[in-house]
């Protein structure tokens, strides 16, 4: 048996967690550069906001319903996600973090102590008590069925936020009323293709010929069909495979037109990518930089390019990665262009045990690991407490986040103050 715990409106819920005054108010969160709606709580959905709505188009709705709007605060969301995971891991032995707001749990052995429904309600209550985040819990024989149960738990209030189904008849009833688009991994194209075969509900898919499904759509959807029948094909991934690449990129708050500004942006991206690389305990040999204009601008000259530098010795040193990124940028930079986005990608990873080739002349910088450890240690106490001069200080091109909330959980200066009167 598997449980899926999914936070309701994660980003919006995180914003409400430290603002009691927003408890009964509609809340929504915007994408990068305050462009589109990417998260809403129940009241914001009820007011008519939809995922992907451009902010400038729905401002009348926002003002009419007094909806609280926030810029995306990824530092806060990541911190709250870690707290959410820690609470669940304190109650379950085998946990897989599927996304920032979703966790799978192996429920093996749980029924010896309590019912699955009681376990689901305990998970939900403990998460709410320790984080204030409200989640839905779905429990079933397979991960795919647990996803469906979770959908039911979050859709119908009468469930109390928990649906645990091990009964064939009740599962069939649920599958018969859900459209096939609700199945984990079934996208819009697959949904349309299945409809031409007369498969419109989840139950229709569960009853489909697995050989035909495999021949038409591939082995993954065939396994999904088997999962809908109660056969576990997707196991829990407690230790996800190591990343094969790291990408740090941003759309600029305003167009970048000077080499100095672009160099500062690329330095910042490279420094952040190197930090992520060290968190993964990996080393890289390949550093790529890409820059591009906006494909939607009809007035600007269109240009997009990418360059790659390959190192002789794998590294995780920010200085080396920044230097390589700047070399790559120099090869593709063009003047008199209004750039809308840039990014840095690291690839060709290896572990610390990677050795120099016999004929390698380069050697790692002395004291590199110790220096990077000091850098990361200082920055754990506050973002960019210590940064590279090449990143600049006043970045006019920085991502636009005019409604950014404080970093309540990671910055001492942002800890909420309670006043007793």
From Swiss-Prot:
SUPFAM superfamilies: DNA/RNA polymerases, Lesion bypass DNA polymerase (Y-family), little finger domain. One of its GO terms (molecular function) is DNA-directed DNA polymerase activity. It comes from the Bacteria. Signal peptide: none annotated. Keywords: DNA damage, DNA repair, Plasmid, SOS mutagenesis, SOS response. InterPro entries: DNA/RNA_pol_sf, DNA_pol_Y-fam_lit_finger_sf, DNA_pol_Y-fam_little_finger, DNA_polymerase-Y, DUF4113, Rev_trsase/Diguanyl_cyclase, UmuC. The keyword Protease does not apply. One of its GO terms (biological process) is error-prone translesion synthesis. GO terms for cellular component: cytosol. Residues 2-187 form the UmuC domain. Belongs to the DNA polymerase type-Y family. NCBIfam families: PRK03609.1. The mucAB operon is the plasmid-borne analog of the E.coli umuDC operon. PANTHER family: DNA REPAIR POLYMERASE UMUC / TRANSFERASE FAMILY MEMBER, PROTEIN UMUC. Involved in UV protection and mutation. This is Protein MucB.
């Amino acid at each position: 048996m598997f449980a899926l715990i999914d936070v309701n409106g994660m980003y919006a819920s995180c914003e409400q967690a430290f603002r009691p005054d927003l408890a009964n108010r509609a809340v929504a969160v915007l994408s990068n550069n305050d462009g589109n709606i990417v998260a809403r709580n129940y009241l914001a959905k009820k007011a008519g906001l939809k995922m992907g709505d451009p902010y400038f188009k729905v401002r009348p709705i926002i003002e009419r319903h007094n909806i609280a709007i926030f810029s995306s605060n990824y530092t806060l969301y990541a911190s709250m996600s870690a707290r959410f995971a820690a609470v669940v891991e304190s109650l379950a032995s085998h946990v897989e973090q599927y996304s920032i707001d979703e966790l799978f749990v192996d429920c093996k052995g749980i029924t010896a102590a309590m019912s699955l429904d009681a376990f689901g309600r305990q998970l939900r209550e403990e998460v709410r008590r320790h984080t204030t985040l409200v989640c839905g819990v779905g429990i079933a024989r397979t991960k795919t069925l647990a996803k469906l149960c979770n959908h039911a738990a979050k859709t119908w209030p009468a469930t109390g936020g928990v649906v645990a189904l091990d009964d064939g008849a009740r599962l069939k009833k649920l599958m018969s009323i859900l459209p096939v688009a609700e199945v984990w991994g079934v996208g819009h194209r697959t949904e349309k293709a299945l409809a031409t075969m007369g498969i419109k509900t989840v139950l229709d898919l569960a009853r489909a010929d697995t050989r035909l499904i495999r021949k038409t759509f591939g082995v993954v959807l065939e396994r999904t069909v088997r999962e809908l029948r109660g056969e576990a094909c997707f196991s829990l991934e407690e230790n996800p495979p190591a990343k094969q690449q790291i990408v740090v990129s941003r759309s600029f708050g305003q167009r970048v037109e000077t080499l100095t500004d672009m160099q500062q942006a690329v330095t910042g991206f490279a420094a952040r990518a190197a930090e992520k690389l060290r968190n993964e305990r990996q080393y890289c040999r390949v550093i790529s930089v890409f820059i591009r204009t906006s494909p939607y601008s009809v007035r600007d000259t269109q240009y997009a390019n990418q360059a790659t530098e390959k190192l002789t010795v794998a590294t995780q040193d920010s200085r080396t990665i920044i230097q390589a990124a700047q070399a790559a940028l120099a090869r593709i930079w063009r003047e008199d262009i209004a750039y809308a986005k840039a990014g840095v990608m690291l690839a060709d990873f290896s572990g610390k045990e990677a050795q120099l080739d016999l004929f390698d002349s380069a050697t790692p910088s002395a004291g590199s690991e110790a220096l990077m450890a000091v850098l990361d240690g200082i920055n754990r106490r506050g973002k960019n407490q210590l940064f590279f001069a090449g990143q600049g200080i006043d970045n006019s091109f920085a991502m636009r986040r005019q409604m950014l909330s404080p970093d309540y959980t990671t910055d001492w200066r942002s800890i909420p103050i309670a006043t007793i009167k």
